[in-house]
């Protein structure tokens, strides 16, 4: 609450938390010229990767590409510190292909700290933020009912554990797992945001006083083992296959160090039996905690209970850095007591003599259900207060980084008296994620997935720059150098597409005979190079093989050209669907409509629509509890009502 204490320092924007969301938020604000401060509990753990030291994966890599296309940092650092890179879903379509990098966690954190320390307009402070300075609007001071969503005041700054006050015009909260954090190993627990680091006190209570609803979520991390005690020669080796691919669109960031291998082992009957015998000792199955954990990153005991018919589960052994023997045991997080964890690890082939350096643990923490936020990530109750990352109920460095960029951008725009930027779900995975967060009543940690987007063929990683870099340039997030690089790339793509649509292969050409000899498919008459590229199992590299190119072009240009041509029909169809949806969202809904009379709506949708009385289908789509099926039902209802009006009008004319 507002205090009479004088401020130690004043800033335009304060970011609370130095994780992946906080770093992106602070950098974005500072690069837009705002006097920005980043407050963190531990300067030595900036942008730490407390769980898997990896960036990317399905849908997550698309997020990283999008953040980079908007001038963010996560993609550049992932490229710089990558130990291994692989393309996932390589044999599938471009909508679901993903780049994943195993990163050097210490190097990643070190490089991020260097960037923060050398960014103009940005200051870093080590302190525990325990309170918020808020000035209430008149007659709003006692309005603390979460159901009432109108603003009750505006942010004035923050207060630290030792009583210092720092004023700001906007505050971004990115507290990760530190609010009320408690780590669990078996039935034993201690207050901590993560292993070896204290939890944050006071801020949850402060948010509750301001009328925010909070809840608890859980996540976990597996044990770390000593690489030198693993029989790696007995295990399947997983090599890098994408050292020439990058998250960033900036060629200055295209650096690849020596690649390191990962290894694969599997659980055994002994593994499963040991877990079954001791399930009652884990925090969840023992009933010590009941917070929901991430569905798509389950503990090993969850896997064995959920998939009881499976005899074995794949486990990956991944390096944590070039200068450490620690190996991350991916897919093997557990809540078992520490004295059983080593026994469990030693049931895995290759790990019979392993040494456990750090035990696995679960962490339980407070979060704010994101339905209390606008799509700009500003809270609905307090003007100028923003929230990003795990505090909003998400899981993952990539999700956090994307939210941090959005929150930092909009906090800066608020200070500059500019309208907030909303990322639409049809324009980006950033928009898809935020739309899901602020409109759906989520009860478990949210992870971005390709299946969450209706427009995933358009929202690919390779075209994130085409979708978002013009916006980034317009907003001041992309500098002139990057803008020139972007335009040069687009020009190359367009020129090559035009060439392929014009130039033809004739049946009598030497290249046509070579194609028939190599593929068994003849060229009949003549064929444009674009139509040749549209053939199944033909790729741009085949144009090079058959001497059908006129110049050497970069790999990212080749990829853009191939996808644009090969999937042109699908892409046009999806663009048409998006345009149709935009038109539909503008359709107005009648005032004081009795939604209870529309039987095709779900019960929850009727309740929410009756209370809210949205002006249009677009507004209805933003309400929590209103599904896509409900929107379709409303659209059908509007069409039927329109037809009824036409019939009534016709009947009146006939009568007259």
Swiss-Prot record:
Q: Quote the cellular component terms of the Gene Ontology held in the record.
A: cytoplasm
Q: What is its main location?
A: cytoplasm
Q: What are the GO BP annotations of this UniProt entry?
A: tRNA methylation; tRNA wobble uridine modification
The record's note on quaternary structure and interaction partners says: Homodimer. Heterotetramer of two MnmE and two MnmG subunits.
The molecule here is called tRNA uridine 5-carboxymethylaminomethyl modification enzyme MnmG
Q: What family, per the record?
A: Belongs to the MnmG family.
| Cofactors | FAD
Encoding gene per record: mnmG
Question: Got any disulfides in this one, which pairs?
Answer: none
Q: Give the species this sequence originates from.
A: Prochlorococcus marinus (strain NATL2A)
Compartments, record wording: Cytoplasm
Q: So where does NAD(+) get bound?
A: 293-307
Which molecular-function annotation in GO is an example for this chain? flavin adenine dinucleotide binding
Described function: NAD-binding protein involved in the addition of a carboxymethylaminomethyl (cmnm) group at the wobble position (U34) of certain tRNAs, forming tRNA-cmnm(5)s(2)U34.
The reply on keyword Cytoplasm is yes
Q: Which UniProt keywords apply?
A: Cytoplasm, FAD, Flavoprotein, NAD, tRNA processing
């Amino acid at each position: 609450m507002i205090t009479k204490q004088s401020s130690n320092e004043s800033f335009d924007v304060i970011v609370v938390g130095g994780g992946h969301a906080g770093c992106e938020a602070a950098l974005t604000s500072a690069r837009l010229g705002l006097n920005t401060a980043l407050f963190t509990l531990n300067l030595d753990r900036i942008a730490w990767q407390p769980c898997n030291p990896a960036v990317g994966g399905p849908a997550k890599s698309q997020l990283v590409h999008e953040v980079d296309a908007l001038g963010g940092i996560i993609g550049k650092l992932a490229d710089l510190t990558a130990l291994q890179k692989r393309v996932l879903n390589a044999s599938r379509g471009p909508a679901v292909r993903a780049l994943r990098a195993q990163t050097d966690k210490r190097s990643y954190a070190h490089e991020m700290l260097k960037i923060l320390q050398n960014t103009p307009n940005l200051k870093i402070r080590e302190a525990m933020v325990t309170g918020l300075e808020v000035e209430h609007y008149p007659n709003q001071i006692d309005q603390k009912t979460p159901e009432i969503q109108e603003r009750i005041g505006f942010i004035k700054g923050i207060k630290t554990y030792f009583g210092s006050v720092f004023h700001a015009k906007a505050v971004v909260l990115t507290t990760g797992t530190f609010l009320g954090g408690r780590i669990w190993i078996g039935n034993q627990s201690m207050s901590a945001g993560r292993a070896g680091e204290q939890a944050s006190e006071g801020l949850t209570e402060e948010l509750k006083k301001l009328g925010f609803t909070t809840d608890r979520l859980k996540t976990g991390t597996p044990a770390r083992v000593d690489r030198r005690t693993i029989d790696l020669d007995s295990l399947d080796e997983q090599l890098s296959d994408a050292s020439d691919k990058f998250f960033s669109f900036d060629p200055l960031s295209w650096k690849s160090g020596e690649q390191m291998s990962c290894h694969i082992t599997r659980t055994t009957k002994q593994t499963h039996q040991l877990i079954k015998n001791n399930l009652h000792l884990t925090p969840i199955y023992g009933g010590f905690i009941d917070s929901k954990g991430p569905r798509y990153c389950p503990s090993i005991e969850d896997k064995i209970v959920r998939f009881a018919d499976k005899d074995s589960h794949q486990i990956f052994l991944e390096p944590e850095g070039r200068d450490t023997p620690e190996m991350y045991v991916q897919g093997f997080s557990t809540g078992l007591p520490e004295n059983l964890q080593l026994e469990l690890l030693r049931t895995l082939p290759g790990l019979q003599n392993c040494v456990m350096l750090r035990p696995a643990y679960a962490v339980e923490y407070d979060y704010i259900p994101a339905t209390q936020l606008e799509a700009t990530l500003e809270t609905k109750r307090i003007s100028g207060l923003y929230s990003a990352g795990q505090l909003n109920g998400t899981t993952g460095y990539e999700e956090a980084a994307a939210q941090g960029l959005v929150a930092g951008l909009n906090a800066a725009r608020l200070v500059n008296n500019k309208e907030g930027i909303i990322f639409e779900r049809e324009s980006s995975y950033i928009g898809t994620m935020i739309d899901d967060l602020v409109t759906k009543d989520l009860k478990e940690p949210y992870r971005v997935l390709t299946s969450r987007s209706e427009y995933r063929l358009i929202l690919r990683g390779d075209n994130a720059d085409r979708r978002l870099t013009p916006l980034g340039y317009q907003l001041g997030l992309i500098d002139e150098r990057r803008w020139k690089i972007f335009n040069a790339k687009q020009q190359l793509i367009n020129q090559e597409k035009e060439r392929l649509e014009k130039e033809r292969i004739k049946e009598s050409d030497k290249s046509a005979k070579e194609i028939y000899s190599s593929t068994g498919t003849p060229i009949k008459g003549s064929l444009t190079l674009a139509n040749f590229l549209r053939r199944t199992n033909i790729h741009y590299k085949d144009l090079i093989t058959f001497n059908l190119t006129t110049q050497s072009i970069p790999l990212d240009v080749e990829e853009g050209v191939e996808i644009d041509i090969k999937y042109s029909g699908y892409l046009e169809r999806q663009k048409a669907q998006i345009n149709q949806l935009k038109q539909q969202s503008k359709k107005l809904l009648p005032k004081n409509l009795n939604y209870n009379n529309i039987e095709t709506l779900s019960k929850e949708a009727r309740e929410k629509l009756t209370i809210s009385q949205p002006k249009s289908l677009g507004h209805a789509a933003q309400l929590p509890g209103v599904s896509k099926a409900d929107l379709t039902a409303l659209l059908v209802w509007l069409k039927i009502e329109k037809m009824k009006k036409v019939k009534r009008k016709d009947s009146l004319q006939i009568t007259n």
